[in-house]
Amino acid sequence: MSTHSGDSTKQQHYRSSDPYSGRRPIPTIPKFFRDRKQRAEKKEEQQREQTENEKLFDPITQRDVEINDVHFDYAKTYDDPSFTVPNQSIQGSSLPSEKPYLSSNQPTNVYKQHQDDLAPPEADNQITRDVPISDEKTNILFFPSPSIDLSYVSKEVKQKTGQYSLFAYIFSLVISWFFTHSIIISAVLPLAISSCMYLWMQNIYAVAKDAEWGAEQKRGEYARLNLIPESAEWMNHLLEKVWPLINPEMFSSVADQIEDVMQASIPSFVENVRVASLDQGSHPVRVVSIRSLPSGEASESFSEKQASEAEHKDEPEQQRKQFYNFELCLAYHAKPVEDATSTSARASNLHLRIVFYPGIKGTVGFPLPIWVEIKGFVARIRFRCELMPEVPFLKNVTFSLMGLPELNVSAVPVAEGGVNIFGLPLISKFVNDAISAAANEYVSPKSMTIDLSKTLLGDDIKKEVNALGVIFVHINRAEDLSKQDVNGLSDAYITVGFHKFGKPLYCTRVVKQDLNPIWNEYAFIPVFPDQVKAGEKISIELWDSDRFSPDDVVGRTKIGLHLLIQDSGKMHERCDTLTGISEDTSLPGRVFYEIGYFPRAEFKPSLKTSGHDITIPRSMRDDPAFQNPHGSLDNKEEEAAVTTAPDEEYPSGILSFTVHQAVNLQMNHPTGTFGNVSGNYNTSPAQSVGDVTAEEGSELPSSYVCVDLDDTLVYKTRTKVFTSNPIYNAGSEKFVKDWRNAMLCFTVRDFKLREHDSILGVVNIPLATTLTTSSQLTKWYPIQGGIGFGSVRISILFRSMKLKIPRNLLGWDIGTLEFMDRQIVAEGTGSVSDVSFSSIRVNIAGVKITAKSSTSNSSSTAEYHVRSRHAVIPVNNRYRSAVVFEFRKQLQRKHNVFAMVWLVDLEDNVEQNIRVPIFTSSKPAHVLQNMIDFDHPDKESEFKIIGYLSTRICFHRGLDDSHEQLVDNDDEAAIFETYRCLKSMGLRRGYVKDMKNPLADQRASLDESRETTTASSKFESDDSVDTEDEETTTDRTPIECTQTVSMVDPNVNGDIQGRNSLGTMNSNERNLEQEFISLGYASKNRPKAHAQEGTNQPGASENVEPVLADDSDAVTIHSNISSDDQKRKLVNADDRELEKRLHRGPYNSKIVRTGEWVKDGAKMGWRNLRRKFALNGRQPDVETEISK
């Protein structure tokens, strides 16, 4: 589908397997109003051009068609349908007889013209009439058979055949005997002549019958070509019998979609809304008409994506692809109810039961149940069926509405024990608009495709990512920008996104008061097919950040997406002049950047496996109950996705995740027994435990799911109110820099009023230890660590991109910086007095620590000591942050002596000795904000190097306890609470350590041993190695791990590591676990990081010695505290956090939790107020399926 929201009539196409996401948001009522207004404006414009109807692309017939929103009277259409039919088709017509208007004896052109005259709606009222069929249902031909009647001929021939044959026999017998007097001739000749006469007469009878049936076939062909509808009373009669037998659960997806639309469109005074049920009743929908549509042009109408796929398919497969198109007109009118207070009487019609929760957001709310009855509707739908030779003979079914359906609903409150004496017109209109907004998503040219071959098999698993590739942008710098502020400078930042889409997908940091900013930042933008179809362009916009007014556009530049795709796989260095809204308008300034498009990488055959879970014992792997579901596999790419592990050669790629549904969600309510225990033999009954006994109820959680990727919130689903089995079907696709160290966490939360949303449970998925034998996995995961119970079904899929980025860019954006030896050494180029100060203030994105001067053992250096409790500094935006060392004296507050190192130059979990210049500058703001190269500075950089600073630091990936001081909003608080939850369960040990795919190590050792064996065999005999056997071994060995592998995660505490089903480990497992426990094995063979050519590495020293960080327990802000009292306080703090999360202790009281919510709300409100007056860029929002 197109992501350009400005044109609602643009062709959009969905598949039933596509979940809701930021690219496919839930439709809302305001968006529906905008789309309807745009269609009305376009129709008025066409009418001004003497066009009757709106002409749009029909995805069914692949032609341009004229569509109209339905404005029929649904009651009249349902109760008194009438159709225009030819007079001669009506038996017993009272009209005077006349010459048939349509006859098979007419010439072809006249015959077709008369067919068109009889085809509705251009019918001639002189030769047609409207026939009501409500009183007496009948199957009527809406187009007459040609006026050819051979029944009297057939009857006459059948009667005279015997007489003529007997006459011929007697006549030939007399003649033959009179002339020959031969007994043989007189016996044979009359018999032959009479037989020929009989067969000839029978042939005339058969020809007459063929001509009569040929006329009917000809009528059907012309009726189909002229789009003539046929009566569907047989189908209505069938619906009357089948309709009450349909399971209402079949309409659950429709109810879920209506609920999503209302949830995304509710006003501010309504907190939540829930569709409790949708029932079809016993009164069926009527099929008004059905007609076949032409499909001959289907083979010539491929979309761009289908055309590209067709190039890789066999020609016979393309030739045998067939389509069948038809149009269906439906009408419904509610049956009158005699007793309006009778629930059973009202339930006979199509209805919904909706519960609104009005109130104040997060504070007050109460349920308001509403009974919604569908009074009637009229809809016209077109279907396109793709046929295939295999069972079930239907591949894809595409449907599209030919105009917005006419709909009317009524809503009344559900008053038990009372009489409903008033209706709710506002709610009726809201529900009506919500249903119309949902239907508007399928009005032509939009459409939906359902893969019936997979639906019948229950296949909803995604086995290919939607993204075609990724755009890699290196934003370097800008020069000579225009003056935007009163001081003649500019607070510049850059956003990267798609031009037509408009929404920024990446935003750089703000460089304050500078006309020549240097960012040196990197952006990764996934590219999807609809963006290629829409002719999108990559837009790089430069903005000026203002504190009290909207940001101003400094300029922009664009580059066509198709140009990058044509020259893919490499970076293009560009220097573009800024332009205005029009590309013809030139603005001051230039922007320097590199950009390139990198497509998907193919699956590597050498990584192919059986796809089995290697943690399961080998004897049980072939059991279907222990195999991962993968659905139907339609092509080699889908088969490779479920049997091929991700490629470590291309660690960067697209990660697709989908949250399908959750089951048996339940909350644990810890309460006291409120009883007395007396006597020695007093026993208490067992408590009630087990599965959930109800699917709906006020005691059940209102759940939603937050998705964290590398400790960053990337997705949030909608809230499903008061249900134990919520269906989300929501997901997204995100770019992952390094799948080997990526971690995906799903947090299921319960929406609460007047308190923080509780954690029901979490699911933590490290990709390296999860995607061991395949790139796709769909699995039920139990949630744990929270106040609830249940399971959630999750699908993940990773697809590598042909992109290799420098090692220093593969890390996480969130982590902690640690001073490993607690020492900072300053060395002066001239005299040590130039760098000898009382202290050094270390500043990282607003987090400051102080290093005091200490006694130096050398007269040429000055040493500074970092306290242990200040040795770890939390970092939230690592790739846009720098470590600034400011040299200070006690009596002077401001100094002009600095040193700095950018965190983009560091690798994750690698200790590095850094040596950076100590400088003084007349323009310190320019040097400290811009990423400059001290060896090759720009023209605006003015500094003097007076010494060098040396220290040993390490950037640890992932959250730490010290990040609590950086929490500024609710989303960050939720992420930090999830981290605390994982840590309390033993699934996190401080920072995240390097992870490794266990089969990758086995492959590496196997390849090494195979190379050794092959090399040694060459000295013995050249013919000793059989190529075929070698290939067989190469393909077979990686398929199955010879023993059960223990999936050891270095981030999990050792006491909870997994074991096999027998509780013991063999020698191979023990060796493998020891290899994983040692981080040195995971990274000791990694090559030394080198900077990418052309990138600046400011302050990078030549004698940097990367050393892998120790794998002992992660160093946190509390790791080096020696005081027993302080350690006791920290233990108590952890206990309080556990009680708070599990609602135990004092937090079991609602009043205490509400007080905590008020206190944290005030704190967050103050921080948000301060952030309002800060200079920030247009950062992308957290993705959700609810459009904003």
From Swiss-Prot:
Region of interest (Disordered), residue spans: 1-61, 83-125, 298-318, 615-639, 1002-1066
GO MF: metal ion binding; phospholipid binding; protein-membrane adaptor activity
Tree of life domain: Eukaryota
Cofactor note: Binds 3 Ca(2+) ions per C2 domain.
Chain positions with Phosphoserine modification: S1005
Annotated Gene3D superfamilies: C2 domain
Binding site for Ca(2+) 2: D485, D544, D546, D552
S-S bonds: none
Ranges of biased composition (kind: Acidic residues): 1022-1032
Any one GO CC term of the record: endoplasmic reticulum membrane
Alphabetical list of SUPFAM superfamilies matching this protein: C2 domain (Calcium/lipid-binding domain, CaLB)
Compositionally biased tracts (Basic and acidic residues): 41-61, 302-318
Localization terms from the record: Cytoplasm; Endoplasmic reticulum membrane; Nucleus membrane; Cytoplasm, Cytoskeleton, Microtubule organizing center, Spindle pole body
Binding site for Ca(2+) 1: D485, D491, D544, D546
Transmembrane segments: 173-193
Name of protein: Meiotically up-regulated gene 190 protein
Annotated source species: Schizosaccharomyces pombe (strain 972 / ATCC 24843)
Source species taxonomy: Eukaryota, Fungi, Dikarya, Ascomycota, Taphrinomycotina
GN (gene name): mug190
